């Protein structure tokens, strides 16, 4: 089934965290995640196999910052194509090994470059679009089913990434931003503003990930639901982080996380997963609770204006 059609069939379950689980497995904070995963493939494949077993319908490729700007910080910009091929291949290998009796969709993960756009920074908008186009082309070449543009702090950067997808291919795209405690992005954008802009640009699903736990996302999802003609996405952290014996932990176990996700379903979220601190157990508990819920019906989007006519 085409992913756009699948999106409107009911709940879609995403995977959970990658980075926090790999840190538990030995990845250091200063490592290039893409290179570390390429050098430790079995750790990553095992994690994604466990997400499939837990009930995830969509796996994110470990290409979060596999763009030429971020890779250049590690002296790896020349290896972007090689790394992309390897990393998408690991997700496909996890699907193959799982022998799942359902289709598992591969999401090409795209995120921030770390560069500031003009006029705050020095990067022209058109150059950022070009950076994302390069990453999008490489992911599309490897056969991803959709793009996950995620953990974005700037609506302008979201626009650049989504434009890159739209001008390169006809592959679906989910877009999620992070919001602060005041309910706005770092640059002051409200959830409903982001929804309206990205929806008008053709994003296939829009929402929130990272930054907070599920209990802090309800108001934002409720605000977006008033204007949404696309599915709404939530991928929260497992609550708040804290240090224990020098290790970052999160305060929501699988049971409390899945319980806190249900109010998000009640206000309209239908595409659900986990971000920092979540594990396959968190996803498994979420899937169990979703069996008791009915997904919000997605309103039909009107692409033209129809005016009443009066006979003369």
PLM regions with names:
Residues 1-305:
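Domain-level signal for soluble alpha/beta catalytic cores
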Residues 304-312:
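Single conserved hydrophobic/aromatic residue that forms the stacking wall/gate
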